[in-house]
Curated annotation (Swiss-Prot):
One of its GO terms (molecular function) is protein kinase activator activity. Belongs to the ATG17 family. It comes from Emericella nidulans (strain FGSC A4 / ATCC 38163 / CBS 112.46 / NRRL 194 / M139) (Aspergillus nidulans). Residues 1-11, 502-513 have a biased composition (Polar residues). This is Autophagy-related protein 17. The gene is atg17. It is found in: Cytoplasm; Preautophagosomal structure membrane. One of its GO terms (biological process) is mitophagy.
Length: 557
């Protein structure tokens, strides 16, 4: 709109001059004044524009601060999550490794215990042959010669180790389950966080430009907010300028009416109830108020003061400007309304983005606070429980390995007992065979000696008969004696080398007449054996063959 500043002159044109020159009548000027006054209600939009700019700047400042805080928290959050899941993986690895080692140890224990039980079963099944034991004794198995208290004590020790390991494993499992509950809560919080972020991102995409709406960023960008604030400031500035043009138009209308005959009272009446905030000052963008022309103050200060005189040409020019501007005033008001509508929309977008940043910050802060609480209070307990299990398992693992070695040693001992018994059977059979060979040699020697003896006796007797009458009896004292006799004596065997002797074995037995082989029944050498303390059992051939088969089978394994 254009405006013409009033200048100094005196007087006002006559109504007749208005008719002569075709100027609008007073009623038309008054209608323009009323319309100009009505257009000044746009001041409310200008004031609102000022509020919008202030709110937008505040929203931008808050968004910048909150975005920076969110970025810092997100960095810490990512580090905490990474650390948390690393700890959980390590704790789970400890549990799985311990469980696997424990299962392998139990498997080895079960196998060793099964071997031991099998060996003990064989000891129970192996009955000592009656010829090895005193006559009349109840039958005994090899197991009767074994003291199982060592096995029972070993089983008790292993059971205690297994129970302690199971208890430690149960405590670790309970701790890990609680840890998993914590992780599940964190996942739920992260789901809420992602939903909030997604919603905020969608809002940012709708409100941002086309190039930004296609961004793959998971967070709304703050880069568009300064340009929006700047656009609001430009709108507010332009609205203030438009309002000033409306005020100038109103001022011209007031001046024109006052310079028209009979218009002073009308001007006074119309300007008496101006819209609030119009008179005194005009708002400007970016500040609380800006100074402007004081219409009502100047008009009411001295209503009887003389008007500055105007020439006819000046008056006509003023009226012409008013008529032209009156046609544009409504468009100016519409433009102000359009601009305030646009500003409200932009402010809504800014506010939505600010709220999105705040929502993301609150969600991030909630997750971060939960993780911080977990890391400072409960996480050390989960880690300590894993360390406690490791310490218990290391101790018990050593005990279990020692017990496993003891089980293997016991099994080897009892298995050796079985082999030794089979060897004893073989040894008895061997000794029996040797004794038979000795007896055979003795019998053969006895027979040969007896034959030689009889032969010698007969020869001596023949010599005595044939030559004895011719030889004096004292020529050789042995001439008439029988030949010497050879007798075999049994002597009890002493202890083998390396075997300690008992006191009653210190004196070796001496032979006497009852111990002479010549007085023994050659058909029953065992009677002589019993008198000399060496009884060699007469074992069945089947028993010996079974023992040989078992030993041969073990050597081939």
């Amino acid at each position: 709109m254009s405006a013409v500043d009033s200048s100094t002159s005196s007087g006002h044109p006559e109504r007749e001059a208005q008719h002569e020159t075709g100027l609008p009548p007073l009623e038309t000027l008054i209608s323009h004044l009323v319309a100009a006054k009505r257009s000044l209600s746009a001041i409310n939009h200008v004031w609102r524009a000022n509020e919008i700019v202030t709110s937008a700047r505040s929203a931008l400042e808050e968004s910048v601060v909150v975005s920076a805080r969110t970025g810092f928290l997100r960095s810490g959050l990512n580090n905490q999550l990474r650390l948390l899941y690393n700890v959980r993986a390590e704790v789970e690895e400890i549990s799985l490794r311990g469980r696997s080692e424990f299962a392998n140890a139990l498997k080895s224990l079960d196998a060793a215990d099964a071997r031991l039980k099998k060996t003990l079963g064989l000891l129970r099944e192996t009955i000592v042959h009656a010829s090895f034991r005193p006559e009349g004794e109840e039958p005994k198995s090899l197991h009767d010669f074994v003291d199982e208290r060592g096995v029972e004590e070993l089983h008790s020790t292993l059971k205690s180790s297994i129970d302690r390991t199971n208890a430690a494993q149960a405590d670790l499992d309970a701790s890990n389950n609680a840890f998993d509950v914590e992780l599940q809560s964190i996942k739920q919080a992260l789901s809420t966080y992602r939903a909030t972020t997604k919603l905020a991102s969608s809002r940012g995409s709708v409100s941002s430009s086309g190039s930004q709406s296609g961004s793959s960023s998971s967070l709304p960008s703050i880069s568009s907010m300064p340009s929006m604030v700047h656009s609001l400031e430009m709108h507010a500035q332009e609205m203030a300028n438009l309002l000033e043009s409306l005020v100038r138009h109103f001022d011209l209308c007031v001046t024109a009416v006052k310079h028209t005959e009979g218009g002073g009272a009308a001007a006074q009446s119309i300007t008496g109830d101006m819209p609030a905030g119009v008179m005194g000052s005009h708002p400007g963008p970016g500040h609380g108020a800006g100074t402007g022309p004081t219409i009502e103050g100047d008009f009411n200060a001295n209503p009887n003061a003389p008007l500055d005189p105007l020439s006819a040409s000046e008056y006509r020019e003023m009226v012409s400007v008013i008529v032209n501007d009156a046609a544009e005033a409504e468009d100016v008001v519409m433009e102000i309304q359009d601009r305030i509508g646009e500003m409200e929309s932009v402010l809504e977008t800014l506010t939505a983005q600010r709220d999105s940043f705040a929502a993301i910050y609150n969600a991030t802060k909630e997750v971060f606070s939960y993780l911080s609480s977990l890391a400072s209070t409960r996480l050390p307990g989960y880690i300590a429980q894993a360390h406690a299990f490791t310490a218990v398992w290391n101790d018990e693992h050593d005990r279990i390995k020692g017990g496993l070695a003891d089980l293997s040693d016991l099994n080897a001992l009892y298995d050796g007992f079985l082999d030794a018994y089979d060897g004893l059977i073989i040894e008895v059979a061997r000794r029996r065979h040797v004794r038979h060979r000795v007896e055979k040699i003795l019998r053969d020697a006895r027979n040969k000696l007896d034959a030689l003896y009889e032969e010698d006796v007969n020869a001596r007797e023949t010599f005595r008969v044939e030559q004895g009458d011719y030889l004096p009896s004292d020529i050789w004292p042995g001439l008439s004696r029988e030949p010497m006799r050879v007798e075999f004596h049994r002597i009890s065997g002493g202890p083998l080398k390396g075997v300690l002797q008992s006191p009653d074995q210190a004196q070796s037995p001496q032979p006497n007449e009852g111990e002479q082989l010549g007085h023994q029944d050659p058909q029953n050498p065992g009677d002589a054996d019993s008198r000399f303390g060496e009884v060699i059992p007469d074992l069945p051939q089947e028993l010996v063959e079974q023992a040989l088969a078992r030993l041969k089978s073990k050597r081939q394994r």
